[in-house]
Every structure is written in C-alpha cells, then in structure tokens.
C-alpha cells in the first residue's frame, strides 16, 4: 500500500482490518515472552536481595531502561538478522500467520518490543515482593510454624502478584500503541505502516481512524 486517499469508510475499515493481524500478533507474542521473563527476574532479584544475583539483574534492568528502545532494536536487527543471519531482515509475506516461517520472521520485532516489558516487570516485581517479604504478616506466618519457603510461596508471592497482574492488560495496550516504529524497522506489514502512510500522504480520514485505534 502506498497511501489511501479520502474514500468511503468501509474501504478504509477493510484496509485497516487486513493489516491488523501482524500488529496484534507481535504484541501478543511480546507480552507472552516479556511478562514471564520480567516476573521471573524480579522474583529472583527479590529473593536474592543484595546478593550477586540481585546486582546482576539490576545492572541488566538499568541497561535496558537507559538505552533507547530504537537503539536496542537496531542492535537486534544488526546482530541477529544481518551478521548472524538467524532471522530474516523483514517479516515473511505469507498470508498464513500461524506458520513457523512467519513466526520466525516476527521474532526480532517481538524481542525488540518485549525488552521494555522485561525491564519494567522485573523492577516492579522486585520492589513489590521485597516490600511484602519485610511485612509483619511474614513474621506471623513463620511464628505459625511455616518454613521460609512455605511463607514465601503461600503468602508473599500471592500478595505481590495481586498487585502486579492487573497491570498486564495495560502493558499490552501500551505496547500495542508503541509498536509503530518497530513495525517500520522490521518490515511488519501492520497498522504501524498504515499510520505512517496516512501522515505522509495527508489522508486525514484514515489518520483519524487509526488514531482511534
């Protein structure tokens, strides 16, 4: 597509729907990969607080937060796609999105998107779990005869996850809105390309439709 000029709304909607699946998929994949890794790193850092594991994870988080996401995306593209050749530079053009070829071609963009989620959830989980572990009810659980491991898994983990899990939906929505540049960089034929084209070709009707999304 090279641009959509002002036309009937049904046509605009059909073009939008046709380009929606790649955008949805890369964001679902990035959430499914980024959230568990971030939670795991945060849990390890909290349980090993002030030990070498915690320090290594904190350095990793600081690097991910400090380096601009576009730089990380360029590094992923250069190292894994260009130098090592593990992944194609652009997404496969196949219409069947649920094949290994298409999934493999999406992975560089997925990794670029999920790095921010990993850093955010690791930091958030570490903070929440560390606070819970020092709470009075943990001492009470130990006095009732629970071992340290039992107190952590039955009480600390449960209470910290109650706060963390509601943010997963908002995380998905925020990543969905921030995948525009990533789609363009990795040749993902999704909504991001349409959005940029609507600006380039001054198609205001289409721009308003995409902005609503």
What kind of feature is each model-predicted range?
Residues 10-18:
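Membrane-helix entry/capping segments
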Residues 1, 14, 44, 52-66:
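N-terminal signal-anchor/first transmembrane alpha helix
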């Amino acid at each position: 597509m090279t641009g959509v000029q002002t036309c009937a709304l049904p046509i605009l909607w059909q073009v939008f729907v046709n380009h929606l699946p790649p955008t949805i998929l890369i964001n679902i994949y990035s959430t499914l990969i980024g959230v568990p890794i971030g939670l795991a790193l945060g849990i390890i850092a909290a349980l090993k607080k002030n030990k070498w594991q915690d320090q290594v994870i904190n350095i990793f988080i600081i690097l991910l937060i400090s380096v601009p996401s576009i730089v990380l995306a360029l590094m992923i593209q250069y190292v894994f796609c260009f130098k090592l050749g593990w992944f194609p530079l652009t997404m496969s053009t196949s219409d069947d999105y649920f094949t290994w070829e298409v999934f493999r071609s999406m992975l560089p963009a997925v990794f670029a998107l999920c790095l921010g989620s990993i850093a955010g959830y690791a930091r958030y989980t570490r903070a929440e779990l560390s606070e819970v572990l020092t709470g009075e009810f943990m001492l009470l659980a130990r006095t009732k005869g629970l071992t340290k491991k039992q107190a952590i898994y039955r009480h600390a983990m449960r209470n910290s996850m109650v706060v963390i899990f509601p943010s997963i939906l908002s995380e998905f929505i925020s990543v969905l809105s921030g995948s525009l540049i990533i789609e363009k960089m990795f040749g993902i034929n999704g909504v991001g390309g349409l959005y940029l084209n609507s600006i380039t070709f001054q198609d205001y009707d289409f721009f308003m439709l995409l902005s609503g999304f």
